[in-house]
Amino acid sequence: VSRWYELCDSAGIYVMDEADCETHGLRGTLTSTPDWNAAFLDRAVRMAERDKNHPSIIFWSLGNESGFGANHAAMAGWLHTFDPTRLVHYEGAQTPYQPAKGLSEKDFDETDPACVDVMSRFYPRVKAEYLNPGVPEGSDKERAENARWEHLLDIAMRKNDNRPVLTSEYAHCMGNALGNFKEYWEEIYSHPRMAGGFIWDWVDQGIYAPGTNHVLYGGDFGDKPNLKAFCLNGVVFSDRSVSAKYQEVKHTYAPVWITQKGDEIWVKNHHSHLSLEDFSCQYQVTKNGALVQEGELKMPSVQPGDSARLCSLHDFKTYNNTDCRLNLAVISQQGVEVGREQIALSDDLYEAGRKLAADAMKRYKSSRRLVTLSTAELLARNFSVIPQFF
């Protein structure tokens, strides 16, 4: 852990240091019991004493999924007294003190207790209309557990509370995940109180079978009970090779965003302290995948948090009836890519695509749950293939 914090100190990565405290299924029982006070407090004291000299650590966390009670309040009080320079976080602070006879929606304190300095949530929703699932049906306990499905922006816009808002767990990376990741960050950047979030989690926790490339997980060892593949929820694979999710995270977390506004290309500087005057922007124009033009654009001196016009689409030569694309990459003085985008320079390619008759598709292979179709090259817009299984 200390080596990781040293690397964060060197690279300027903001860190939340979390106490090793999780009681999970017991919820608030232990934190509301005086007999456990010393054990809870010990976790906070050891963490702060061990890591107090790391400048990358900007706030402490009281733990994870342990309900909330007097013992957590004691941890927060000690940390505030020991180190008044750092904030104290705990997502579980919104849960009830004592869930002895089950939970109901009214048990959740939407305003969050005063002993924490951050309003924190698991998996809040974003505003985009198509990303708003309904609260699931179920028992009062199940509905209460999902009462945290608040809209992220609504929390940040509360007028009676000006604390920063954090998603201490979000963007669950199981399977082909992160489909709405960019929408999350468009919303996070839209309000100054939004502080970001922590993806669950970094690496698939599978184990390779000796001498094979087959990943084993729950149940593959004869272990019962198990959670099957639920441990495979990382941004990277078990061998730390990158996944498509990794590419999405890299693109969205980039400190420089490149966007198209009509015929113009703009850059947004998401750095906290750096202007873009010492950065460069390299470009390539491709025609049907082949490089036909490349060079470097003058990067405007964009201050932290600001946007500026980079160039116009008319600055680049285009070719009719071809797949013509503009690739842009913002590069630091150290040669590190900090932003990338690809923009289509020709829309007529798709308009020229012919409509393919349904009977031109040949069924190649089928089963009850899968149909594989083979066709000629298909150029079309707004189409779908709907297999008929019955």
Give residue ranges: language-model regions.
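Substrate-binding/catalytic cleft of secreted carbohydrate-active enzymes
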Residues: 1-226, 231-232
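Carbohydrate-binding surfaces of carbohydrate-active enzymes
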Residues: 187-390
